[in-house]
Amino acid sequence: MSVLSDLINLNLSDTTEKIIAEYIWVGGSGVDLRSKARTLSGPVNDPSKLPKWNYDGSSTGQAPGKDSEVILWPQAIFKDPFRRGNNILVMCDTYTPAGEPIPTNKRHAAAKIFSHPDVVAEEPWFGIEQEYTLLQKDIHWPIGWPLGGFPGPQGPYYCGTGAEKAFGRDIVDSHYKACLYAGINISGINAEVMPGQWEFQVGPSVGISAGDELWVARYILERITEIAGVVLSLDPKPIPGDWNGAGAHTNYSTKSMRNDGGYEVIKKAIEKLGKRHNEHIAAYGEGNERRLTGRHETADISTFFWGVANRGASIRVGRDTEKEGKGYFEDRRPASNMDPYVVTSMIAETTLL
């Protein structure tokens, strides 16, 4: 095993200028991530300098077998925390050979919204709180839970410490450091209310970069759980009953909201979101109806309301924002399996266009 470990951690820069680029894309389910690697002649820092590539879309549920080629367009580069050195992770979106975005390519439409002059002028910031659950590999039951049974009731686990309360911290901290190494603007982590469930936060990030960073942070987490022999679940309600679900609360502000008088801008934006509540819910993740029940710090899926410091609301405004008269708000509706390109661009579109 030591020889294998040595080879995995081999420093290529001693013998070659070539680097490895891991191309990453969203798969056919719209939630799964796929990747493959290629050798490049030297370091690259600009995604526009990277070659386009292709893959077999019939094997990912994204193209028919008789016309299976899907083209990868590199969009964002991050440092590779696994191979290190000058090696990179490349977030791509996906197109037909004719250059048309395929249905699972949600980045293309989002980029159009974020490049609109009215949106650019407002410099939209996003901070996404990604909740997730770690499952035992062979039985798909949360780590730290007794086989075929349940732990004690919720209460001691949120931000908890100790072997009987916090399960999987080694994975969480490994992910935290790997994201920082990669150049992702990860801003924190914490244990969640349900044991075996955790959260990391990405942001504040501007516009389309929020989606790029969250997808790559998910990819890194998937790779780390793969190494650890643990299953990563983004199911919004992995365990039925009196247990919290998993969301992706999305914090949002614009330049006008962050400036003096921004609280009035925030209230008008929330009013706009309320008018399109059903459209947003339809785009905020699969299975969200199992999570948005009006219990466990959620609003009922069929209602829309906002409140200050209210974690049972659809939209929460913080006490500091109310006090200072400017700041941001939190959309608490998105599910843990949401597509960040869809959610962030939809919030920007509804509030700014």
Curated annotation (Swiss-Prot):
E.C. number(s) listed in UniProt: 6.3.1.2
Keyword match Manganese: no
Domain GS beta-grasp: 19-99
Molecular functions per Gene Ontology: ATP binding; glutamine synthetase activity
Family membership: Belongs to the glutamine synthetase family.
Quaternary context: Homooctamer.
Protein name: Glutamine synthetase nodule isozyme
